């Protein structure tokens, strides 16, 4: 057998002397001795992190949650940088972009324009004839009525008289806010005139600047018409004998004056005379010209020309179609993807800024708590004994004080500290108070988990073997014990982020802390604004912040579960 051939004992051999076996009892084996050796691995070894990634990728729910979180993070980063509303004049908008004229504007998406869904329109019922007239006869460039959904004629019988009135259901455009009287600097006025002249719309139909409305002059004329109709004389000729008629005229004119003041967009003549020939103080009808258009009451100068502007004390007063003026002044259309709040701020932009602030706050506080908790728990769990006993009693004392009390104390003390407010600002004071309150006891949970894991693994054979070979405490803690506890720690750490976000949102929603007054916005402050606006009247203000915070809570939970399984060393090999 010098040639390394393999022989096996024949199975037919019976009882033989095994000390003296003859050669003929052996036969040649079919196994080649040269092939009896270890074979090289055909695949590369899987590292710890790669194995964790492979295990994480197998959890589809966690992968989807990760991408949703990534989208929200990108949304929070990109939108404040890309939105033109972020780059408006800081002198004109010291607290960021806002326009009260677009208060509670509805969500608008160009993709759905004209569909009745997410296009800035809404359907409302209960419009009276006068309401319909005000909206229908509008001299702005954008009529607020999209279409008439329905109109119902109702009757009310009072004795022998039957009063008929029409009730309209209309779809209106929340961005068609009509004409507004504003003041502009001379330089801005010159730019506006040049802008209109370049486009050939200066003082013509479709122009941004509209003629002033002079209701006072018309009402003075109408007062004389009433006196002439009732008494056959002018108003100034009325004597004390006709005092009751004069009182009636005064009451009607006062009512019409209030009506014009309440509806500044009315540019046409109104009549208080009813079909029965009496004068009403409550309902007014439009006076139409022969061509069917309302008779206007535009202001005219001494030459009979329409007045489009007035200069006084260094500024121009103009009446403009506000939507078109906004585009001219700011360079972009005043559309709000998620709608606007009571101050006319863009919810889409504020929600991105709020999500960014909430995420940074959550990640920052969680990171600090994780570092403190791991160090504290590692020392207590590794050394145990009296060290652990003392550290646990300190932890018990700290955890006995609620964080809300710490937050209240810090808010009061930091706010009253003039030097601190001057150094970090009002916003910094609130952030610092929140940071101290949640770092004060937020690390205790991580410390307890770390301590438990160290008690679990410090007595394992591989740790004892490393200690026998002379490994120092630092190497045992960070090289051998801590990596095996990473799975559990990662899960609790990741779930800490949505916990901080939810705590901040809850406190802001309840009004305990208010970042809005300091110029900051968070998801919680947006929820508080939505709750104050009312779900029934302005549901969009509450809907979108609720969706974002719900996605964050659910996705961080699923993401944390996926990381727990990925970093669990007992599952190593399950990815194959």
Predicted regions: what they are:
Residues 1-58, 78-343, 576:
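Membrane-topology segments of multi-pass transport proteins
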Residues 7-9, 14-41, 48, 73-75, ...:
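Aromatic-enriched hydrophobic runs in primary sequence
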Residues 45, 60, 548, 552:
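Aromatic-acidic/polar surface patches that form glycan- and anion
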Residues 61-82, 374, 550:
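Short, strongly hydrophobic transmembrane alpha-helices
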Residues 57-62, 356:
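Short, solvent-exposed loop/edge-beta patches enriched in aromatic
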Residues 60-70, 340-576:
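Alpha-helical transmembrane segments of integral membrane proteins
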